[in-house]
Amino acid sequence: MKKRCVAFTILLCCFLAMTLCAHTDAPVNLSDISAGASYYFKNTTKLRAEVKNSYFIQQGSATDGEYGYFLALSNEKGDCTILKVDLSDYTIVSETPGVAVDHGNGMAYNPKTKQLIVSRCTDHPNRLSFIDKDTLTITGSVEMPMRVISVTYNESRDQYVVVHNHDRQFSILDSQFNILSTYDMVEDMFSNQDIDCDEQYIYLLQWQSSNGSNVNYIGVYDWDGNYVNRIKVRSLSEIESMFHIGDRVILAFYAGQVIVGEAQLYQAE
């Protein structure tokens, strides 16, 4: 019995030592991102939406701080449904079909104009369309000098960022959509998806299909166009769009339906 107790004590001590020495990845915020470290998002699914009438391909998304607005594409119809989602409990408030924004690859929200701005991407590749956030109807548009795949907006800077659809570049625009600066992207092996930003960083979503699996990364740049780092997104689905409210990050995916989740950022040890 004494030998068994000694053996058990030794095993217990070894287990405790291993536990104390084990590294645990630390949760961090977007503002904590810096060069040299390794980061990843762990996503928790909050909504799986079976949208009516063939609208099931998630594309761009944006938020006004209370609701999320998600574009669901119909390849059959060539337009989108806008899903308005209450972000307090992820219930769908409304579905607005037949919104003529083509592919609707990217979307931003401008609280100063109370408009959603959509990059149309396919049939009208240079066009950004404006949508009234209350009526969810198109109220106007602007033609850009280049093809645009995605768009985001930062209120404190009063500036937009757009990703080009014909090269590996992104541009910063003023509030009237005039180009202020253009920068090259570092990652060149992935397909560009939507884009997000805050006062500190610009987040460029990228996806690649590799051996039948989806590989998702988010490139992080500062507002001077400098590449800072990238975030790996741990998900088997194709990432489509991202927005965040403070430190609360919402990601949208496509996997045969619209999938929305909340993501926690971790710094890998």
Spans of model-derived segments:
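A short helix->beta-strand "capping" segment at the edge of beta-propeller domains
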Residues: 28-55
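A short beta-strand motif characteristic of beta-propeller blades
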Residues: 42-52, 91-97, 137-143, 178-186, ...
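Beta-strand-rich domains and repeat architectures in extracellular enzymes and scaffolds
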Residues: 48-79, 103-106
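Repeated scaffold domains used in trafficking and secretory/extracellular systems
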Residues: 54-62, 101-109, 144-156, 188-197, ...
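Structural motif
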Residues: 77-83, 124-130, 167-173, 211-219, ...
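Short loop/turn segments that connect beta-strands within beta-propeller blades
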Residues: 86-90, 131-136, 174-178, 221-226
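Blade-loop segments of beta-propeller domains
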Residues: 90-116, 120
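Loop/turn-rich, solvent-exposed surfaces of beta-rich toroidal or solenoidal domains
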Residues: 187-220
